[in-house]
């Protein structure tokens, strides 16, 4: 590696060390490096070395061995020439860096626990202990707050009850009568269990008397309107027959006296009957209207037919 160089032989046979050769090649003949660094490049300097986190250790002292070996290499003529030793880099800064390396500040630490460690608890003694929560206070009647004013719902008045007109409702009376008859039939049916018989016998006399009196009063109230309605219908029928007979006799005389007046009055009577029926029925019933027209024609035009036939 460190053979004699022709330039050194001409200048006094001085032998050049490997360090000098490397220095010359690095200054003059070193090829241009690529900008991209490679992992295997020993001359590359990392970011950690630039920032100072990792000490930079140069391996210049490793070249001392080859330099000494090169200085003692024999020359071509058989003589051993002692060359000049290459200037070595001082080893003191390296030693200082190695000594200062343990004292550098560590930039990482062990992960701390997520929850802090609880302090040691004292040893509890046996016996009752006070609770952490206070006991509830006892409130007497005097401690209670006075009742406040009633809510708005209590001040509200109920809706007025609608007064329905007094109508004769046959359907309601019929349903009530059927329900009472069905109840009586069920009570009179044989084959009931002894439990129902015992329950009926064990009822108080007051309840039985009250129910019986209420039933009798209800029946009495039901009988009176029924009789009154029947008598009213019979009376209306008698009055209608008498009124129709009177009109028939009157139109008989009118047709004999003046037929024109009798015709006008007959039309008016028929219209009056139709209006009366509609007012009484309070419904638009075609059958009732036709019946009223037929009765009016019979009363007013019947005498004319008898006169024409006689």
From Swiss-Prot:
<feature type="transmembrane region" description="Helical">
    <location>
        <begin position="231"/>
        <end position="251"/>
    </location>
</feature>
<feature type="compositionally biased region" description="Basic and acidic residues">
    <location>
        <begin position="183"/>
        <end position="197"/>
    </location>
</feature>
<keyword id="KW-1003">Cell membrane</keyword>
<feature type="transmembrane region" description="Helical">
    <location>
        <begin position="286"/>
        <end position="306"/>
    </location>
</feature>
<dbReference type="GO" id="GO:0009274">
    <property type="term" value="C:peptidoglycan-based cell wall"/>
</dbReference>
<keyword id="KW-0472">Membrane</keyword>
<feature type="region of interest" description="Disordered">
    <location>
        <begin position="178"/>
        <end position="209"/>
    </location>
</feature>
<dbReference type="GO" id="GO:0005886">
    <property type="term" value="C:plasma membrane"/>
</dbReference>
<feature type="region of interest" description="Disordered">
    <location>
        <begin position="22"/>
        <end position="163"/>
    </location>
</feature>
<feature type="compositionally biased region" description="Basic and acidic residues">
    <location>
        <begin position="56"/>
        <end position="66"/>
    </location>
</feature>
<protein>
    <recommendedName>
        <fullName>Uncharacterized protein Rv0497</fullName>
    </recommendedName>
</protein>
<keyword id="KW-1133">Transmembrane helix</keyword>
<comment type="similarity">
    <text>To M.leprae ML2433.</text>
</comment>
<feature type="compositionally biased region" description="Low complexity">
    <location>
        <begin position="198"/>
        <end position="209"/>
    </location>
</feature>
<dbReference type="GO" id="GO:0051701">
    <property type="term" value="P:biological process involved in interaction with host"/>
</dbReference>
<feature type="transmembrane region" description="Helical">
    <location>
        <begin position="257"/>
        <end position="277"/>
    </location>
</feature>
<keyword id="KW-0812">Transmembrane</keyword>
<feature type="modified residue" description="N-acetylthreonine">
    <location>
        <position position="2"/>
    </location>
</feature>
<keyword id="KW-0007">Acetylation</keyword>
